[in-house]
Structures are given as structure tokens and as C-alpha cells.
């Protein structure tokens, strides 16, 4: 929940640990930001729905349940036709156990793969509802069913920027007058064995003997990202709706932005998308460097991506303090953006900005003021959270204390 998450960030707690979700001994990198002791049965209803929920979907469902409780929203007291859900999701990988028998039946005597045998085996071996576990839109669908949210429902799958774009869409839905209240969320688990094998480990930190310090955004000695998992959900409402029900308002969204930096396939983004997104959201929010409290950075902990982001941040907001929560919990894909935005909401509400773990040696290629060692206080209670992807998309959300 929000309180545990917030105190863990303020205390600089480490969320990186050896992977024990499955047997990871065959992997080169065997650590990540795994959610410990997660029991979906505490949240998912009806229980039979678990059969058609991947771990990503379970996280999203649980986060929505916690968000509703935190916001004091009872779904039966909300107009269901003006209550919607928008979620940012990753591609959801299939479980190997589900496909093993089908795959073995598709192998011929000489060891080659037969698509004819595969198509025959799949009809006999796979459960009819198997696909529902792996459709990204099912997170928003399950949540809407459980919460009786019959209003606008959408899913955005655009890599690391997915969940901030979900916030942007949810805000737009309310501004267009289509809904009074929206659940905007993001979920992802990059610790799935199929995902780990498919993505490879070229961009990952190899600090297996010191995994607690592996994720070190913007630090000179960073050597790669750390995979993680998680989800977060914000309850977004029109002010009129929130005040009418006597809500505790944690913060207010000032503006959102989305930009894209076209690039050649062989090149990583140079940071122009981040720069454009920051300039756009600053202008729309009416903020400047004099009244901007902090930047919540994407902060992957990879060499070129961190440098590109840091230089873009410095070009737009100069020495505005920066925090990078992935240092605590790793990279949760589409879940990260909402987790980071939630951290900034709690920061502007409290007036305290959490530090970045493992930032020890400044990198000249990252000319930004990284908050580290201890939380920072006394800053304006405004913030911008920014995400960007290796394909060049960038998104940003500006918020303020109410």
C-alpha cells in the first residue's frame, strides 16, 4: 500500500533480491526487484478469476483494490456509467509450463518444428481460456468488472511510457466530460522467465555479487538496468466529484505531455523526446525552474540512456533536483511510470523528496543534481515525472500539492 511504499522510499530501502519465483540458476543474471510474499488471493475476487490472470494482471488488480481503499471510494456509491479504467501494460509472456507439452508434440522425429503438428496439438492441449492470461487489456477489464466501472475503458501498450500515457488518457476522459472518476494504472513484471530469455542480458547489470547496489541511476559506475516488477494505480477525479464526496485530495495534475524522437533502428534515443516532453508539460502547467520542486526521472541505470536523459533534463530545467526511484525497486516496465508518479504525488503531499539509492560518484555525462543519501525538504511542492523508451517515445506528467 501507499504508506509502506512511501516509508520504504524515504528510508532508502533496497528492493533488489535473488529471484526465487522460478529456478533461475540457468540465467546469467539471477537477481531483480521481485515483489516478496505476494498473495493474489488476498485481493482477487472471485477467486476463480486467478485461473485467467497472469502475474502482471494480478498486480494491477491488487493495486486497484488498494487505491480504491486509500481514496475512500466505495464503488457502489459511484455512478458506474461515469466510472472508468485506463491501464498501461506490457506485452505479457506465456508461461513455459502451459506450452511445453504442445511444443514437444510439434517436434518431428528429426528434431525440426512442424507447424501442422503445432496447430493440431494446440487445439487438444491448451485450455480454451488460455489466451486470456496474456492479453494486456485484461487488466483493465478485470478491474472494471470487479469495481463495476462501466465507463470508458482502455489499455495502452507502448513500452516504458505506457502508464504515464494512461494517466494522460484518463485525465482527457474526465476533461471531455465522459467520466467523473477514473482508475489510471500501470503494471508489469520483467521477471518472467520467458521475458528474461527473450530480452537477453546485454543491458542488465552484472553485479551478482553485490546486487543491492546494482541499480545506480546516473552514477558514474552504473553498468546496466535491474529488472523488476510491480504496479500502481491513481484514483483520478474531477474536483467537483472529489469535493462532493469529501475526498482527501493528495495532489492535482497540472498537465501531461507525449512526444516522440524519430530515430534510426541502430541508434538509441539522444534525449530529444525527453526534452520536448519536458518543455511541453512545463508550458502547459505554467511552471518554470523557479517553482518546480523536483524531477522524477526515468533513470534506467544504463550508460547511454541515463546520459541522454540527464542532458535533456539539464537543458530544460537546469539544476532542479532529480530523484530516480528505480534505484529502489528496479525496472518494472509499464508498471514503473505509475510507481514513480505515485512517489512524486506522495512527495508533493508531504513536502519531502525521497533520495536515489546507490548514487555515489557523479558522472560528467549526467550534469544533473541527483538527490541522494537523505531526503530533501524545502522545495516547491510541484513535480514532473518523465519516462521514455528505447524506441524514442517520451511522456511527462506535472503535478502539484492541492
Name what the model sees in each region.
Residues 13-17, 210-287, 293-294:
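Condensing-enzyme catalytic core mediating Claisen C-C bond formation in acyl metabolism
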Residues 21, 77-87, 154-158, 179-187, ...:
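Beta-strand segments within the central parallel beta-sheet cores of soluble alpha/beta enzyme folds
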Residues 107-126, 168, 172, 176, ...:
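Glycine-/small-residue-rich "gating" segment that lines the acyl/pantetheine channel
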Residues 75-80, 285, 289-291, 366-402:
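Flexible, low-complexity linker/loop segments at domain and module junctions
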Residues 3-8, 92-111, 174-175, 196-209, ...:
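A glycine- and small-aliphatic-rich helix-loop capping segment at beta-alpha/alpha-beta transitions
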Residues 178-223, 256-269, 297-306, 320-369:
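Acyl-CoA/ACP chain-elongation machinery
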Residues 60-73, 136-147, 153-188, 226-247, ...:
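Active-site-proximal alpha-helical scaffold in enzymes
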Residues 4-6, 10-147, 151-153, 188-196, ...:
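Conserved beta-ketoacyl condensing-enzyme motif
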Amino acid at each position: 500500500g501507499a504508506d509502506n511504499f512511501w516509508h520504504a522510499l524515504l528510508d532508502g530501502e533496497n528492493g533488489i533480491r535473488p529471484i526465487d519465483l522460478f529456478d533461475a540458476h540457468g540465467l546469467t543474471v539471477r537477481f531483480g526487484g521481485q515483489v516478496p510474499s505476494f498473495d493474489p488471493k488476498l485481493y482477487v475476487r472471485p477467486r476463480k478469476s486467478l485461473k485467467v490472470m497472469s502475474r502482471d494482471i494480478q498486480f494491477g488488480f491488487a493495486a486497484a483494490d488498494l487505491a480504491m481503499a486509500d481514496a475512500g471510494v466505495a464503488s457502489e456509491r459511484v455512478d458506474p456509467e461515469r466510472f472508468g479504467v485506463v491501464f498501461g501494460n506490457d506485452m505479457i509472456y506465456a508461461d513455459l509450463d502451459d506450452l511445453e507439452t504442445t511444443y514437444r508434440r510439434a517436434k518431428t522425429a528429426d528434431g525440426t518444428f512442424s507447424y501442422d503438428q503445432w496447430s493440431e496439438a494446440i487445439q487438444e492441449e491448451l485450455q480454451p481460456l488460455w489466451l486470456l492470461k496474456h492479453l494486456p487489456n485484461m487488466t483493465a477489464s478485470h478491474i472494471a468488472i470487479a469495481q463495476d466501472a462501466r465507463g470508458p475503458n482502455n489499455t495502452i501498450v507502448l513500452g516504458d511510457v505506457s502508464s504515464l500515457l494512461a494517466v494522460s488518457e484518463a485525465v482527457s476522459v474526465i476533461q471531455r466530460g465522459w467520466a467523473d472518476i477514473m482508475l489510471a494504472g500501470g503494471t508489469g513484471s520483467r521477471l518472467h522467465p520467458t521475458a528474461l530469455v527473450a530480452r537477453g542480458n546485454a543491458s542488465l547489470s552484472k553485479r551478482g555479487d553485490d546486487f543491492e547496489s546494482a541499480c545506480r541511476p546516473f552514477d558514474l559506475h552504473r553498468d546496466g538496468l535491474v529488472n523488476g516488477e510491480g504496479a500502481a494505480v491513481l484514483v483520478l477525479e474531477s474536483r467537483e466529484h472529489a469535493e462532493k464526496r469529501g475526498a482527501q485530495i493528495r495532489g492535482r495534475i497540472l498537465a501531461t505531455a507525449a512526444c516522440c524522437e524519430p530515430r534510426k533502428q541502430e541508434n538509441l534515443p539522444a534525449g530529444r523526446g525527453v526534452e520536448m516532453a519536458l518543455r511541453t508539460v512545463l508550458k502547459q502547467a505554467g511552471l518554470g525552474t523557479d517553482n518546480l520542486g523536483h524531477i522524477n526521472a526515468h533513470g534506467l541505470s544504463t550508460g547511454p540512456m541515463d546520459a541522454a536523459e540527464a542532458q535533456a533534463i539539464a537543458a530544460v530545467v537546469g539544476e532542479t533536483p532529480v530523484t530516480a526511484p528505480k534505484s529502489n525497486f528496479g525496472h518494472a516496465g509499464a508498471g514503473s511510470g505509475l510507481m514513480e508518479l505515485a512517489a512524486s504525488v506522495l512527495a508533493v503531499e508531504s513536502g519531502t523528496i525521497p533520495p536515489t539509492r546507490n548514487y555515489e560518484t557523479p558522472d560528467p555525462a549526467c550534469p544533473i543534481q541527483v538527490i541522494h543519501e537523505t531526503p530533501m525538504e524545502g522545495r516547491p511542492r510541484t513535480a514532473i515525472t518523465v519516462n521514455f523508451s528505447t524506441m524514442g517515445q517520451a511522456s511527462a506528467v506535472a503535478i502539484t500539492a492541492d
